[in-house]
């Protein structure tokens, strides 16, 4: 029999110490990685519940195990809330990750050797959209589209490629693209060439739920997403689809890719979907965009750095560091030493290797969750530029660390 007195700190102090150290890092550093966010206490409570004990292969009302009457309620809540949030015909909340959701789409609609078309990873796409080392690039014939001279999606070239190659699937979505995507235009060309139109909205899902970014659901055959990032839920994946594709997608997830779903994570997803339907969440997403725009403006117009695509229309943007003679890898490290967390990122036509890069990616979701507004966003942008202007100056790094500490103390992630 278990005892509530057997806390993690008591049972495994070594692991507890590592978790506490990570908690301090999250509180004491400004998080600007665009794919990261902080979840609510309610989301964590659901994910840490006894639902982790239950096996539930199958779907609500059709399980391969007994005793699923309560997890059926949990999963159906998540499904219904998700469909309502995005206006979808059908939804699957079981994918353990965005990558597995993407694999399910490929399994449902294509066979190895078929042609798929997605955005080039080198120009802002995602590795699961056809990167050569990923399953999507190894199993399928990949045609990649990219950006034009303005560093915006080259829709005309994309359409020409689609007509030439007639892919089985056309993918819209990105991991490092700051602008709005014209999903309606993608849908038109997909219909013209007879392709399944799939949108990966992982980065933009929270903005879409709040109405601040175009909703792909009315236009796409299938839409995938993670549940973290801007959606501010637990780490996991989801799939939205038109009614006629529900059976194919559900079969691809189970039994195609996964066995028993993680019902404790699905419960946490359900909480996040409920939170995302509130006015407070809409206000949050409005602030996310405002903060990103302020940082891009300050870094670009006031501090002389080049912003890829010239602006942001979302939560994220890329900074070209070549004028500072510093690589993305070096910038990530030195900013990290100043307690500002970013990630190195390739820029279009990057001369550096992918693990070095000429740029960094900056995102505003996590900093906005802790309460930062345009005032703090402007301060943070100047702190970033100060570090990039003098990456070897210990006094500058110490001063910036101090300023970061003051901001973090004023805006704790998890207050009382």
Curated annotation (Swiss-Prot):
Subcellular location: Cytoplasm
Highest rank taxon of the organism: Bacteria
Record-linked InterPro entries: PyrdxlP-dep_Trfase, PyrdxlP-dep_Trfase_major, PyrdxlP-dep_Trfase_small, Ser_HO-MeTrfase, Ser_HO-MeTrfase-like, Ser_HO-MeTrfase_PLP_BS, SHMT-like_dom
Cited HAMAP family: SHMT
Stated role: Catalyzes the reversible interconversion of serine and glycine with tetrahydrofolate (THF) serving as the one-carbon carrier. This reaction serves as the major source of one-carbon groups required for the biosynthesis of purines, thymidylate, methionine, and other important biomolecules. Also exhibits THF-independent aldolase activity toward beta-hydroxyamino acids, producing glycine and aldehydes, via a retro-aldol mechanism.
Family: Belongs to the SHMT family.
Protein known as: Serine hydroxymethyltransferase
């Amino acid at each position: 029999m278990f005892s509530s007195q057997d806390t993690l700190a008591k049972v495994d102090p070594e692991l507890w110490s590592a978790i506490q150290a990570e908690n301090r890092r999250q509180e004491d550093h400004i998080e600007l990685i665009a794919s990261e966010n902080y979840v609510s206490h309610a989301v964590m409570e659901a994910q840490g519940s006894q639902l982790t004990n239950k096996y539930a292969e199958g779907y609500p009302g059709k399980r391969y195990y007994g005793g699923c009457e309560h997890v059926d309620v949990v999963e159906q809540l998540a499904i219904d809330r998700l469909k309502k949030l995005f206006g979808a015909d059908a939804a699957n909340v079981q994918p353990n990750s965005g990558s597995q959701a993407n694999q399910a789409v490929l399994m449902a609609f294509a066979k190895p050797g078929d042609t798929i078309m997605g955005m080039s990873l080198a120009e802002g796409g995602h590795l699961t959209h056809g990167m050569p080392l990923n399953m999507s690039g190894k199993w399928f014939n990949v045609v990649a589209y990219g950006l034009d001279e303005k560093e915006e999606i080259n829709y005309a070239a994309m359409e020409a490629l689609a007509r030439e190659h007639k892919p089985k699937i056309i993918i819209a979505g990105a991991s490092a693209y700051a602008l709005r995507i014209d999903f309606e235009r993608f849908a038109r060309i997909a219909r013209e060439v007879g392709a399944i139109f799939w949108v990966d909205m992982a980065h933009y899902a929270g903005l879409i739920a709040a109405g601040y970014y175009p909703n792909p659901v009315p236009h796409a055959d299938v839409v995938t997403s993670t549940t973290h990032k801007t959606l501010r839920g637990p780490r996991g994946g989801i799939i939205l689809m038109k009614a006629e594709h529900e059976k194919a997608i559900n079969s691809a997830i189970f039994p195609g890719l996964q066995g028993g779903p993680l019902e404790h994570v699905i419960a946490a997803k359900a909480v996040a979907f409920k939170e995302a339907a509130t006015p407070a969440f809409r206000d949050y997403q409005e602030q996310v965009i405002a903060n990103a725009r302020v940082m891009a403006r300050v870094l670009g117009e006031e501090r002389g750095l080049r912003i890829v695509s010239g602006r942001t229309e979302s939560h994220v943007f890329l900074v070209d560091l070549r004028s500072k003679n510093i690589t993305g890898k070096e910038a990530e490290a030195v900013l990290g030493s100043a307690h500002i967390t970013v990630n190195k990122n390739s820029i279009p036509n990057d001369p550096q290797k992918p693990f070095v890069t000429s740029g960094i990616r900056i995102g505003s979701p996590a900093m906005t969750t802790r309460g930062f507004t345009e005032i703090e966003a402007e301060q943070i942008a100047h702190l970033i530029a100060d570090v990039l202007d003098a990456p070897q100056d210990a006094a500058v790094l110490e001063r910036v660390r101090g300023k970061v500490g003051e901001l973090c103390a004023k805006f704790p992630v998890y207050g009382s």
